[in-house]
């Protein structure tokens, strides 16, 4: 399964990292899709990707744009995000499933 995770509020938490590790161990193809700006905010994102073993080719920055277009283009089947607006847009505009997470 093709699964994607947001960074802020998801992969930058212990719970989000643990879920991503479980999905990877399960054989899922995991991507990172973040609204962060690649030029200014990429180092932390790439560090998380390295820690999880996610290749840089599966890290996508939308640079403040909605994530649903990237999710649709990549054929992502499940996306985890903490932003309700992004969650709703994914559900409204794609065939992908999404889960709204609230991690500490």
Show the residue positions of the predicted features:
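Hydrophobic/aromatic side chains embedded in well-ordered alpha-helices
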Residues: 2, 75-76
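Short, structured coil segments at secondary-structure junctions
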Residues: 26, 52-55, 74-75, 93-96
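Alpha-helical substrate-recognition element adjacent to the catalytic core
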Residues: 1-65
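Helix-boundary and membrane-interface capping/anchor signal
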Residues: 71
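Acidic, Mg2+-coordinating phosphoryl-transfer loop and its flanking beta/alpha structural elements
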Residues: 76-104
């Amino acid at each position: 399964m093709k699964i994607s995770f947001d960074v802020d509020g998801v992969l930058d938490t212990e719970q989000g990292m643990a879920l991503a590790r479980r999905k990877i161990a399960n054989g899922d193809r995991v991507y990172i899709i973040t609204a962060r700006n690649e030029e200014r905010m990429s180092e932390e994102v790439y560090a998380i990707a390295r820690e999880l073993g996610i290749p840089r080719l599966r890290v996508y920055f939308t640079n403040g744009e909605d994530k649903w277009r990237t999710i649709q283009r990549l054929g992502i089947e499940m996306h985890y995000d903490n932003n309700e607006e992004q969650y709703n847009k994914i559900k409204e505009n794609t065939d992908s499933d999404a889960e709204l997470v609230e991690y500490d």
